[in-house]
């Protein structure tokens, strides 16, 4: 059900050519979303024919002549959102029936959830990253974090508590881990809804269009580890709850 006047969900994705993947994403959203929603597509400098297509199929389209990057594109798309909840998903994903109802159920059941993510599999490697099942799983803080394949969040919390996506990272990776660590540092949890299995091709855009992808990846990895050094290397200390330890980590 699409209801532009008062959407419950704002679904945001990025486009940078690779139109067939975005078409499959849009098809899965249109066919499998039952709650009121709006679809926002941010085009990061695609060819003119792809940009025209984006304007035709999106409920709201943001068209840029140059690539704004992953965090920049999602931040600008989220700024347009009218929904109570945000789904920020890669354009090389496909969503199953009932995904929206189940993710809303989960985020409303867990008021301390900062991010709800579905289970997902890589279409290229046929390897599950978070296995599907019947339950809900809370990820241990400052440990294994989910990739930013599909983050489902409360819009106001995303903007005003977590501050959106960090702009410290280049176009390859790192911003999803940064947002997860920010959520944990603010005292919230990351929850996996195993009932929703999303098909994800995996780095279709970045690896196909960036000749120096690995260079960016290594630079972003160094930036992330510098910023989150104590949380990354000493997670057991970060999970301590004594006032003295909390005060020490607040200074990081």
Language model segments and positions:
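A recurrent flexible, glycine/aromatic-enriched loop bordering the glycosyltransferase active site
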Residues: 122, 134-156, 172
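Short, acidic, metal-binding catalytic loop of nucleotide-sugar glycosyltransferases
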Residues: 27-36
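Conserved donor NDP-sugar-binding/catalytic core segment of glycosyltransferases
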Residues: 93-129
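Glycine-rich, basic loop-to-helix element that forms the pyrophosphate-binding segment
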Residues: 64-81
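Donor nucleotide-sugar recognition loop
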Residues: 94, 143-145, 159-199
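Active-site donor/metal-binding and catalytic loop motifs
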Residues: 121, 192-211
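Short aromatic/hydrophobic "clamp" motif used to bind/position activated sugar donors
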Residues: 86
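A conserved acidic beta->alpha catalytic loop
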Residues: 41-51, 96
């Amino acid at each position: 059900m699409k209801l532009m006047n008062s959407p419950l969900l704002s679904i945001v994705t990025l486009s940078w050519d690779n139109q067939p993947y975005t078409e499959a994403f849009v098809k899965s959203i249109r066919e499998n979303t039952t709650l009121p929603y709006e679809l926002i597509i941010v085009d990061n400098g695609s060819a003119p024919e792809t940009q025209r297509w984006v304007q035709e199929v999106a409920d709201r389209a943001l068209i840029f002549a140059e690539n704004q990057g992953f965090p920049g594109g999602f931040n600008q798309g989220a700024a347009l959102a009218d929904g109570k909840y945000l789904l920020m998903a890669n354009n090389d994903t496909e969503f199953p029936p009932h995904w929206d109802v189940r993710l809303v159920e989960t985020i409303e059941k867990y008021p301390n959830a900062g991010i709800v993510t579905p289970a997902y599999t890589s279409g290229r490697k046929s390897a599950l990253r978070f296995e599907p099942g019947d339950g809900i799983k809370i990820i241990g803080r400052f440990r294994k974090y989910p990739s930013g394949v599909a983050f489902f969040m409360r819009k106001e919390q995303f903007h005003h508590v977590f501050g959106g996506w960090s702009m410290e990272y280049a176009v390859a990776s790192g911003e999803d881990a940064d947002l997860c660590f920010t959520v944990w540092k603010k005292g919230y949890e990351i929850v996996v809804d195993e009932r929703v299995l999303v098909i994800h091709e995996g780095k279709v855009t970045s690896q196909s269009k960036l000749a120096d992808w690995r260079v960016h990846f290594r630079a972003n990895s160094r930036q992330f580890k510098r910023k989150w050094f104590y949380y990354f290397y000493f997670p057991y200390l970060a999970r301590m709850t004594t006032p003295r330890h909390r005060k020490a980590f607040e200074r990081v």
